[in-house]
Amino acid sequence: MKRFVTIKSLILVFALLLAIIPVSATERPFASNGNGVAAFIRDDAGNVVGANLTLSGHGTHLGLFSGTGKIQFLPDANDPNISHPAGEITYVAANGDRLPTVIEDGRMDLGTGIATGYMVFQSGTGRFEGVSGRAAIVVEQNFITGAYTFTLVGNINY
């Protein structure tokens, strides 16, 4: 009888230990697409130096989302037709969970309005707390209206 109680106690301790071990983040495929409007920011000389963004779309792990952001356009020292967007964008899922991102390796062709780069996921709220990963982004910008479309493909860890 005493041996049976000891075995039950060991099983209980083992089960409790398993329950407190943190679950590691899982890498998952991520894809989204959407559209938005850029409200361009100009310097005193009238040059576009940045933009305030509003956006919406649909993405894996986000569902329908909205978002806002602010970017700066950094000129390329070697090519006046190229700009390097830098900044932050926060995606907000329909349930309110927030997924902040930072632009990395941004490159925009000012002749075509096509931009590429990476969105690096930052720790957010809700299910995106402690998130990591990144997704390649392609943006097609209309410089006259400020409208743009975008597509992201990559991996997210949470």
Residue ranges and their predicted role:
Residues M1-S9:
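Positively charged n-region of N-terminal signal peptides that target proteins for export
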Residues T6, P22-A25:
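Short, low-complexity disordered leader/linker segments with a strong preference
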Residues S9-A19:
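Bacterial N-terminal signal peptides
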Residues S24-Y158:
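Beta-strand-enriched cores of mature, soluble protein domains
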